[in-house]
Structure formats: structure tokens, C-alpha cells
Regions:
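Catalytic loop of the DD-peptidase/beta-lactamase superfamily, centered on the K-T-G motif
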Residues: 19-62, 249-407
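Short, surface-exposed loop or secondary-structure junction motifs
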Residues: 121-319, 323-325
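Secretory targeting and sorting signals
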Residues: 1-22
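Residue-level preference for non-acidic, small/hydrophobic
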Residues: 38, 57, 88-91, 95, ...
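Short active-site loop at a secondary-structure junction
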Residues: 47, 70-130, 176-185, 256
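Hydrophobic (often cysteine-bearing) scaffold residues that line and stabilize catalytic clefts
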Residues: 30, 34, 83, 87, ...
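Short, solvent-exposed loop/turn elements at domain surfaces
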Residues: 60-62, 70-73, 140-142, 353-354
Length: 407
């Protein structure tokens, strides 16, 4: 959920010796190893980082660095964080519960439910499944909205109606024929929210609350709506393409069901574990959720995007999850399919550059920590930051890269 470019296209191809190693056991996390990798993130330039790692029945929560640049307050692991596009996994799960209930079909044309919003041939051709796996061919409205600091200033204080966000995306040139190819678009998930409302007659965020947040007791997770603040303990949110600026107060209605949510690392791990354990969806529907399309067809090792969730090959097996990027907060939440390894982590700074930039040292340090958490027994954890593989960010991919002009 961001105006930016990809952090890195793929995880690097590793030597055969690394790939051949057995996956890590579900034993107790190596706290010293994790602490060293986490501490390296603020040392590389991030104000603060927080994380929760779960291995089997053992949890490790920690933070490093500063919550604010303007006052000496350390980052705390329980702080709430804007999770951006990880919102999509919650929303997709709610849509798929409607599928399980027989109230909606994945291959229903969107125009069946939203005839006035997506009229005509496009409404007949684009299906619910295409929205959820980003193969609809509908443009990404955020690319049209964000082109300068002035635009960001306006977004920060503006309340957007979901229908207006969708209209912006539909007015953009198609990114491809419906169903033809993956092209990440926030418009798809605003439409998914409108679908929830059309089917249930209820507010989409309220349906996510009722179906997912309340049953799982995710008390640190919410849709803030038009409230620009983050309720409860939180850090600053520093947007830094041209110098750090705190954007922790932001009207997130521009993200709505594509990227509005706030959560904690503990809540994210609880949610994804319940999802992948089959507690939220039927086995058949969960299987469809995980059946993905290539994110970069020319690079199969980049992983696949399912229905609101993506797969990521690593040296110790496949992980599932999502990342999120909004102004000032970046988040990853990644999980092994069997539930023995989970990591959710966030940093309180974001930067976007035109084109395909070389990774910043703090990008590399953070990804090194994430890989250490996922693969503690592989040789990834012993690599230097300069040679560590890089994780993809679907929220910052080519074609999802509105450029921010200098102020």
C-alpha cells in the first residue's frame, strides 16, 4: 500500500548447499542471534524497529532504536503500527468467508454485485477472483493521486469516499486484459470492500471486525476510519524521500479496505496462524486462497500471489504472508505453512525513489533480520548485510510507483 517502487524484485538465488539444508526445528528461538540482527537495523539508519518471532510454542518479542526522532523514547515491541496492504489479507479472508457461506462466488462477475460502480463489459469480464489476485487489469488509483508533497499534504487531511477511489482507478488505462496478468492495484481491494457491503448490507470494516478481529481477540487491530491518530502506544511515522517528516497523524480513508488498518506484530502472527491453520476458512476455500499467479512471470523465484496473500521461497522452505507500506511505516508478516515459524516486524520510516533503486543499507539490515527469523539454521543468518538476499515487496513494485517530487 504505497506510492513507491519495489524494494527488490526477488529473493536471491542461493547456493545449492544452502538450499539443501534442512529447515529449522521448532525449538526455542536463538535470542542472541535475533537480538544482534534486530539491533543492526537501527544501526543501519532506521529510527526504530519492532518484531515478534514465533517458533513452535516459543515467542520472542523485541524492539530496537527510537520511537521518535524528536524525543528520547525507545521503540517498544507492543506498539501499534500502520500495516498498509496487510489489510488486504484481512479483507480477502472476509470475502472468502462469504464464499464459504454460499453468498458470493469467486467467479461471479463484479458487475453482478456492483453494476453501477463497474458497469458494462468490464463489469461482466472482471471476476471476484481477479480482484483478489490482482489480475483484473484495473489501474491503481494511488499512482494517479500521489505525485508531489502537495498531494501528500492534501491526502493527509482529506476524507475520500470509496466510490471516488474506484472511479479514479477505473479511469486509468487498463494494465491488461481481465485475467491475463498480475498487476498490483489498490483499486481491486476497495472494490472488494464494496463487494462485502453489497453482499452483507453492512459496513466492510465492521464485517472484518465481526468476522475476524473479535473472534481472534485482536485488540490491537483496527480500522481507524477518518481518525488521523493511532490510538494506544505507537511510534512516529517518518517519511523520508527528502528528509524525515513525521506523518503519524494521517487520515487513512484513502486506503480504506486496501490499506487502512492498524495492528501489532503479535496480532498479525495470531491472525496468520489462525488463517493458515484453517480456523477461518474451509479447507477447499483456503486451498484456493493459496493458489497463486506469478508476481513476476520472468522470475519464478519471486513467488506467487494468491487471494490476498503471497508465497515467498526461502532457503528453508516456502513462507506465506504480505507486506505493507504507508507513509512512515513499513511492515512484513511472513509465516511457514506448518505454523512452526512466524515473523512480523515493522519499521518507522519509509522512503520511495524513482525507478529501481539500489537497496538502502537499512533495507538490507531489516531483510537480514527477517531471514534470520525465518531461517535460523541456514547460512543466510551468517551472511553479511552486503550479500544477504532481498525480499520482494508487492506494494512497491514497478507500475506501482507514483513518483514524489521534491518539495
Amino acid at each position: 500500500m504505497a506510492a513507491g517502487v519495489m524494494l527488490a524484485a526477488t529473493i536471491a538465488v542461493l547456493p545449492a548447499s544452502a538450499a539443501a539444508q534442512p529447515g529449522p526445528s521448532a525449538g526455542r528461538p536463538d535470542r542472541a542471534e535475533l537480538r544482534a540482527a534486530l539491533t543492526a537495523v537501527p544501526e543501519a539508519g532506521v529510527p526504530g524497529v519492532l518484531a515478534e518471532v514465533r517458533q513452535g510454542r516459543h515467542d520472542w518479542r523485541a524492539a530496537a532504536g527510537q520511537a521518535y526522532l524528536t524525543k528520547p523514547r525507545p521503540m517498544q515491541p507492543q506498539m501499534r503500527h500502520r500495516i498498509g496492504s496487510i489489510t488486504k489479507t484481512f479483507v480477502a479472508t472476509a470475502v472468502l468467508q462469504l464464499v464459504d457461506e454460499g453468498r458470493l462466488g469467486l467467479d461471479d462477475p463484479v458487475g453482478k454485485w456492483l453494476p453501477d460502480t463497474v458497469p458494462g463489459e468490464r463489469g461482466d469480464q472482471v471476476t471476484v477472483r481477479m480482484l483478489l489476485n490482482h489480475t483484473s487489469g484495473i489501474g491503481n488509483y494511488t499512482n494517479a493521486m500521489i505525485d508531489s508533497y502537495a498531494a501528500i499534504n492534501q491526502m493527509q487531511v482529506t476524507t475520500y469516499a470509496p466510490a471516488d477511489l474506484v472511479a479514479t482507478g477505473l479511469a486509468m488505462p487498463p494494465t491488461g486484459a481481465p485475467g491475463a496478468t498480475f498487476s498490483y492495484s489498490n483499486t481491486n481491494y476497495v472494490l472488494a470492500g464494496l463487494l462485502i457491503e453489497a453482499v452483507t448490507g453492512n459496513d466492510a470494516p465492521a464485517e472484518v471486525q465481526r468476522r475476524i478481529l473479535r473472534p481472534l481477540k485482536l485488540t490491537g487491530t483496527s480500522f481507524p476510519g477518518t481518525d488521523p491518530t493511532i490510538r494506544g502506544p505507537h511510534s512516529g511515522a517518518y517519511f523520508a524521500p527528502f528528509g524525515a517528516r513525521d506523518l503519524s497523524e494521517f487520515n487513512m480513508s484513502w486506503g480504506w479496505t486496501a490499506g487502512e488498518m492498524i495492528s501489532t506484530t503479535a496480532d498479525l502472527n495470531t491472525f496468520f496462524r489462525a488463517l493458515l491453520d484453517g480456523d477461518l476458512l474451509s479447507p477447499a476455500t483456503l486451498k484456493q486462497m493459496l493458489d497463486g499467479v506469478p508476481m513476476l512471470p520472468e522470475l519464478p523465484e519471486a513467488g506467487t500471489y494468491g487471494l490476498g496473500i503471497y508465497s515467498l521461497p526461502t532457503p528453508c522452505g516456502e513462507f506465506w504472508g504480505h507486506d505493507g507500506a504507508v507513509f512512515g511505516h513499513l511492515t512484513y508478516s511472513l509465516h511457514s505453512r506448518d505454523g512452526t515459524r512466524q515473523v512480523s516486524s515493522g519499521i518507522n520510516i519509509s522512503h520511495y525513489q524513482v525507478g529501481l533503486p539500489d537497496p538502502h543499507p537499512f533495507d538490507i539490515a531489516w531483510q537480514t533480520f527477517l531471514l534470520t527469523a525465518m531461517c535460523p539454521t541456514s547460512d543466510v543468518s551468517s551472511r553479511s548485510a552486503e550479500t544477504a538476499p532481498q525480499l520482494p515487496s508487492v506494494t512497491r513494485m514497478p507500475g506501482n510507483d507514483a513518483a514524489v517530487a521534491a518539495p
